[in-house]
Amino acid sequence: MKYLVLVLCLTSCACRDIGLWTFRYVYNESDNVVFSPYGLTSALSVLRIAAGGNTKREIDVPESVVEDSDAFLALRELFVDASVPLRPEFTAEFSSRFNTSVQRVTFNSENVKDVINSYVKDKTGGDVPRVLDASLDRDTKMLLLSSVRMKTSWRHVFDPSFTTDQPFYSGNVTYKVRMMNKIDTLKTETFTLRNVGYSVTELPYKRRQTAMLLVVPDDLGEIVRALDLSLVRFWIRNMRKDVCQVVMPKFSVESVLDLRDALQRLGVRDAFDPSRADFGQASPSNDLYVTKVLQTSKIEADERGTTASSDTAITLIPRNALTAIVANKPFMFLIYHKPTTTVLFMGTITKGEKVIYDTEGRDDVVSSV
């Protein structure tokens, strides 16, 4: 039995709720996490056109397309071993739907990893220099790559001169982080969920089709467990403009996530079963199944956003007139496409780099904020 490896690589943003539900299983209360619901569902949409029968029914992800731009680019590539016969109608649909062609490679060759890495590096203009570190299993016959990249700056940047070292409180540990600070007119609101209070604030990007939702709760885990698309849309509908002082850490997070277990718990099972997988829509041999679903995601947030910008808008008003949004404890962020409410990237920040106080005596951490 041959098998297919599904690899998702993202660097930095609805899909059916499967993307948000998956985050419930990859969330880690003791570490920072970044994940792309759109990256996962866009890859599954490719897999779905190759599937038939119950395998197709389980991969139930409707199309949710965010148009490419110089600020946002989604890349889907399919690498197929030269020995695997493909149905012409499948290759035609793949090329038509995703504006690229199936790439033929020899997976049992010694340089296949370098060939794929070089191809992706060229296609992304160097933004994704490497997608494969370890060698692939020599029995691999297909590899699906989904790459989602977003580069944009805040509509109103944070002034770097206001960035200072501040405490970040997480459980029994206090970290020292670089905390950004600005005053702006933003959409914000305070909500309550299962007796957990939390605020949601929208931080718009310069390109107005995307924005970040900053969610600062009293109990982050409770919000993660309740998260779905209807809740996100509820936030968006009910936020109101207010003059806010936003205090949040600069952060850089990279996550490598194995999504197989999460997808199986959400009902995508036949695709991973050698005896039940049906990918006969792609190949008449119909002897493929999925063994891996890996997603590598990265995001950076600083005073400018993710690219340089000269916009600065700081308004001085009486401090007692401000709504204070202070993310000095574990929080969630979601970057979404406003026309479609598609969640492109999301993540949680639960720790900083340097411990300055620990009631349990720990004195070291490895993640960076």
Curated annotation (Swiss-Prot):
Return the PROSITE patterns for the record.
SERPIN (PS00284)
The chain's coiled-coil residues are none
Entry keyword set: Protease inhibitor, Serine protease inhibitor, Virulence
Q: Name the InterPro entries on file.
A: Serpin_CS, Serpin_dom, Serpin_fam, Serpin_sf, Serpin_sf_1, Serpin_sf_2
Which residues does the annotation list for site: Reactive bond?
A: 319-320
One GO cellular-component annotation of the UniProt record comes to: extracellular space
- Specify the domain of life of the species encoding this protein: Viruses
CDD domains in the cross-refs:
serpin_poxvirus
Q: Name one GO biological process term.
A: negative regulation of vascular wound healing
| Keyword Protease carried by entry | no
What job does the chain carry out?
Answer: Important in virulence.
Family (UniProt): Belongs to the serpin family. Poxviruses subfamily.
Q: What is this protein called?
A: Serine proteinase inhibitor 1
Q: What is the lineage of its organism?
A: Viruses, Varidnaviria, Bamfordvirae, Nucleocytoviricota, Pokkesviricetes
